[in-house]
Amino acid sequence: MLRSFYNAITGMDVSRFALDVTSDNLANANTVGFKKSRPIFQDMVSQVVVGLNTTTGTVKTTTFGAGAVVDSTQKVWTIGSFKQTEITTDLAIEGKALFILRDVLTNQTYYTRDGRFRINREGYLINPNGLYVQGFKVNPVTGEVTGTQLEDIRVETQIPPKATGEIYFNPPTNLDERAPIIDQTTTPFNPLDSFTYNYRYTLTIYDSLGREVPADIYFVKTGTNQWKVYFLASLKERYINVDWNGDDDKTDIVFLDLFNDQVHIADNGTFSTLPTFASKTLEFDPSTGKLVYIPGGDIVQDTANQKFYLEVDLTPESGPSEINDPNDTESYLNKLGAKLGSETNKIKIYVGEGILQNNVIQNSYITQHAADFVVTMDQDGYARGELIDLYVLSEDGVVVGVYSNGETLPTYRLALAQFTDPEELVKKGSNLYASVKTPTILLPGGSNKIRSAVVEMSNVDIAKEFINLITAQRTYQVTQGR
């Protein structure tokens, strides 16, 4: 049979392969994260005759082709268009990297551009096939990466209550310089007497059980550019079962009505009002109205973080009262009525940060100007919370849980895989790729930014693929002799 017939058959084969590749591209035109492919063909040679023209000194070759053969398919890694979905767990990568997934059944690692993720009932971030998205653990306060190994990204479906440990004065907070001075030698502080203090501010804090405790902060101007601050609590109808001896169970319940009052529980079981109230002294610079730091004074300097704070001890002044609980270890009752983990319960109250100039705190959260009294405060405690939403910070890829108590906690940061040669990736179906080589693990940002509430669509250009389809079909017909 003539050689040309065999050549035509190879042409039919490669054209049919081109039709297969092109039709696959068209079929996945709407597949999220799909990367189109192109067929790579090579020619075949059956015989080469080389001749030398001795007169001219030139070489002549005669080549007998043997048709064409399929070499491979090559994926085209251009970025597809982004489509908004309004689903916060839908993600896209603005770059060439891929998401990392783990199959918990086989421990096999896969890679994908398909960012349609969701949270399962255990709190894991998974893809549509149930594979676990990988990332690095972060500090829930700062959001900085603390993990060194890839982990399954999991968001706590509920967070336990957290007792208030830090309170923050925030700008604007101003103590009116025009306020009258109160002589405490003749008018001692009494929280029930409004004539013994200039201002009062109430802040809700939390105990270790997540109960709200209204904490009252009283401001007393005791001298020119000098104030005293008292930190008390307004408790109402707290009932506790107290074993005064601590050696047997108590059946009688002692009812304590502590509404706007302070009660001291002595070791012998007697009651008395607290004789003194803990206070802190603030001094202000007369020229700037900013706080003055006095070494050895009530304001403590945190040199590591360049912050300044007051430290308030909420433990009763005569020592904590013990409560006998057969189901618990020794417990304590502080001035706020909250259960403590130890005998001391010191809260830091931040009042400024930055550098000192002539002992003046340059970034003073509290000022003393001739302006209206205003206080802005915040604290770090909260009640128990249930997970109600989740979102991913754009660009950085930090996964944040949103809870019913109003808290938003960073948990993980997405990990991305970057391959020097994308052809190392092998298609596994379901928008997944596998690789025998280990990629470079990256954090989102820079050239690989995360986009939230969007997905990357296929990079297939339908018009171009139809042209390729028609070209391959015509070539197929020609090789058939039509």
From Swiss-Prot:
Example of a GO cellular component annotation carried by this entry: bacterial-type flagellum basal body
A matching Pfam family: Flg_bb_rod
Keywords: Bacterial flagellum
Main location as per UniProt: other
Gene Ontology annotations of biological process type: bacterial-type flagellum-dependent swarming motility
Localization per record: Bacterial flagellum basal body
Family statement drawn from the similarity comment of this UniProt entry: Belongs to the flagella basal body rod proteins family.
Protein name: Flagellar hook protein FlgE
Classification of source organism: Bacteria, Pseudomonadati, Aquificota, Aquificia, Aquificales
